[in-house]
């Protein structure tokens, strides 16, 4: 698990003009601590890429599995994909807005074992308040699952 803050390894935008709502925090404050639900997935890294995608790496343990510790349960896989897409939207909105997932579709292509995983998200279309995103999950360079989601952007309460 990440030990230093901020937990998202990002080139932070300049603080002027990027303040978050009422408590006057900038985007670096938003990503300062790992949210509790991400600790369950054992998040290990998060960062934007040069080609306008966002990567989140996880290393789920056996506590998230069924089948005698061999397969990560599909709901947790879905959660990791959703997390990657959501964190990308938060990053792109500089923390001023957060996404609410309206729907998510996941295709499971291979079993997901405990251990290192890499999720990659991109934004396929972004409107004023509705965004369409996609994410893929890889393990050992093999495609495990794909997802697409519709998200409604709302003002950040933070």
Indicate residue ranges for each PLM-predicted region.
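Intrinsic disorder/low-complexity segments, especially N-terminal tails and targeting/processing regions
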Residues: 10-12, 18
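Terminal targeting signals and extreme-terminal segments of soluble enzymes
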Residues: 17-158
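Short, positively charged low-complexity motifs
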Residues: 6-8
């Amino acid at each position: 698990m990440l030990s230093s803050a901020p937990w998202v390894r990002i080139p932070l935008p300049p603080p002027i003009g990027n303040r978050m709502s009422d408590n006057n925090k900038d985007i670096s404050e938003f990503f300062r601590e790992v949210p509790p639900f991400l600790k369950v997935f054992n998040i290990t890294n998060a960062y934007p890429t040069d080609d306008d995608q966002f990567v989140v790496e996880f290393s789920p343990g056996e506590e998230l599995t069924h089948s005698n510790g061999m397969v990560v349960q599909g709901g947790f896989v879905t959660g990791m994909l959703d997390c990657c897409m959501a964190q990308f939207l938060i990053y792109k909105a500089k923390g001023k807005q957060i996404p609410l997932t309206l729907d998510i579709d996941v295709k499971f292509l291979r079993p997901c074992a405990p251990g290192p995983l890499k999720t990659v998200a991109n934004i396929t279309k972004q409107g004023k308040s509705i965004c369409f995103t996609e994410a893929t999950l890889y393990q050992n360079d093999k495609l495990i699952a794909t997802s697409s989601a519709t998200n409604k952007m709302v003002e950040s309460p933070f």
